[in-house]
Amino acid sequence: AGRGFGTFVSWFLLGGDIYTAYTFIAVPALVYAAGAAGFYALSYTIMVFPIVFVFAPRLWSVARARGYVSPGDFVRGRHGSQGLGLAVATTGILATMPYIALQLVGIESVLTVMGIGSPSGSAWARDLPLIIAFAVTAAYTYLAGLRAPALIAFVKDILIYLTVIVAIIYIPSRIGGWGHIFGVASAHLKTVNPATGKPYGSLVVMPAGEWAFATLALGSALALFVYPHAVTGVFAAKRRDVIRRNAALLPAYSLVLGLIALFGYMARAVPA
């Protein structure tokens, strides 16, 4: 990308990198299973952008001046240690592998809903569409570099916004409204989980869970922009003020994340 992405492209790129299949699958699933605990994701995406506003522009300036293009480059250059840079790069790869695996699970879920690679078929028939999708994505990214996810992000993010807006209006109108949704969710969360002997969760964070909620949200906020794909997106910005401007604009995605989390409650209210 040659550090040439402006505010508009960077907004879609960073938003697309951060809000992925995890957003659509894991967050609603946690809200579905445990209630308010799943909204930690909304809290940490609110906290992360002030951190980005303060530290990311300085990171970009040093990387641009020294020609760094990855977190490993940055650490190796700043600390003069090839081993430390290699350790950071290896840690980034290992930490990203589960993240990538979740994206593949998301793709598989979408293909299954579309009737492609049905679970009822053989393992090969089920996995072949996923392998093809991954190969196409990998080849496109290899050939086009960072421009590939940036271009895809335009289409993907627009579809996300449209899908969420339609779903948040249409689905409640079909299953009894928000009062019914929260009523059903609350009733389920109050029931006792046989495995733990405690309620499944609650609609609001209870005092006993406040520290767990807060530390999980804070730790996630501190870690989000340490992921290699997020740092690379920052490095691709054209100027320092592009990063600051995006730190101010990216919370729009947090609003959408909050609406997506509500899908978990909606799923609970859908008749079996």
Feature annotation, model-predicted:
Residues 23-30, 105-109:
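Membrane-embedded alpha-helical segments in integral membrane proteins
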Residues 15-23:
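The first (N-terminal) embedded transmembrane alpha-helix
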